[in-house]
Amino acid sequence: MKLKIRSHDVELSDDLRAHLERRLNSALGGFGDQVDSVVVRLSGPNGDGKNGDKRCQIVVRLQPSVKVQETDADLFAVVDRLSLRAARGVTHAIERRR
């Protein structure tokens, strides 16, 4: 599984990168070659005035692609929640293909 992490207006620390890799490998690693790649996009505070909320979007490339996203101030917590949601979405997409 190829993992790409893109960050805009958010510091991508080594700890956050390691956390992302660990959580996504744990959640999606079991799907093997059915998952082509995973793209994670992190972006800084949004323009609607919320205090420091950051956006995380995870796109899992397979047929069809699975996309989950959420906004929260704690990126570590968002990654935890979204990795599980992405895994459920991939499971559902694979079951629909059968």
Task: Give the ranges of each region predicted by the language model.
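N-terminal, polar/charged subdomain of small-to-medium soluble alpha/beta proteins
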Residues: 1-98
